């Protein structure tokens, strides 16, 4: 087999899987947050140094490589970005909000950080 074709096919599979998994996790997590009246849109973007971001207009951007991480790490990133829909910065108020949504977020962030090099480079 052509190695480039295999790589392209694998990346396409990961993107499709990411779209499915992130939509399912977002649909489960978002309704728990009283400041959200609807599910926010999200798109996928490969990023070298970020797992996600939130635009000022409220669009979530998620790294498709995140789908390779454990579910608790995916939930952490999604919750992190959903909290930005209420607090657009990393202020103490933001972290209080994140603590209220996911009290053990720091443990999941540490796990994700420990896996980042492997997940982002495969």
Each model region followed by its residue ranges:
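Active-site-proximal or metal-binding-adjacent scaffold patches in catalytic folds
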Residues: 1-76, 85-122
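Walker B catalytic acidic pair
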Residues: 81
């Amino acid at each position: 087999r052509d190695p480039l074709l295999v790589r392209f096919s694998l990346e396409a599979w990961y993107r499709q899987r990411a779209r499915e998994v992130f939509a399912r996790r977002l649909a489960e997590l978002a309704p728990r947050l009283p400041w959200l009246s609807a599910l926010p849109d999200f798109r996928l973007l490969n990023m070298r140094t970020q797992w996600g971001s939130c635009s000022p207009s409220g669009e979530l951007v998620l790294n498709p490589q995140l789908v390779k991480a454990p579910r608790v790490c995916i939930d952490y990133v999604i919750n992190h970005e959903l909290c930005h829909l209420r607090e657009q910065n990393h202020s103490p108020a933001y972290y209080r909000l994140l603590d209220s949504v996911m009290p053990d977020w720091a443990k999941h962030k540490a796990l994700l950080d420990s896996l980042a090099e492997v997940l982002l480079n495969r």
